[in-house]
């Protein structure tokens, strides 16, 4: 059996376990990078007390380093799963990525999920690298990860891939537990599940604003969306789904904003989460966009948790 086939078989066996472990709804946030570490520790304890089982953290230019950040948050919590959404493959070589994951899963069994992704051309350029053939590059990177030397205890690091298009989704099914799509409307979840098949894990990010005021909610949504609409991977994915250039312009049409970011009361947010589940998602990680940036980042989650959990 080849390494790739073996990983796929193992992934199918483990994906259902991880779907249950993550729970139906988790949290995705970059807010913690803006807080002192002491406040981030308090945040993860608050998430646990609310009943969430998983927290997804990002990694970008200027953010905390993914493995160090995950280690801090794992140490501060008792049961919470910390997932990287995602760790950038351009930020470290494949050996460092593999062994960072092995270290954390050894220290915190069943509580660390390694999400990795190919990033975006502008970010890669700033790192002095050239972005090209992302699927092929990811495949080669995974080969190098799987062959990485390690003198510590033999442990298997559970991983998912950031995936939007069909080829990366299929690679997620072949070489990982599954996929972590980001910045997608619900129709993408249907497509993702079809490409993955029934076994692999599908963990979808969903942005949300807890506000009934259309002007306030859409303003918060557009602040969030602007940077992503300027990135080809996200823009091209939306075009592939049938959205026009006019929809993508000026922070997004109202129709696109409402498709990418759910807003309203906690019931409206739960309805969007339920639609992702109906279309094949195992886990939906809510990224709650704050309308009051001075308020604690967990305030809105308290209201949402009462409905979605």
Question: How should these model regions be labeled?
Answer:
Residues 1-309:
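Active-site-adjacent structural elements that line small-molecule/cofactor binding pockets in enzymes
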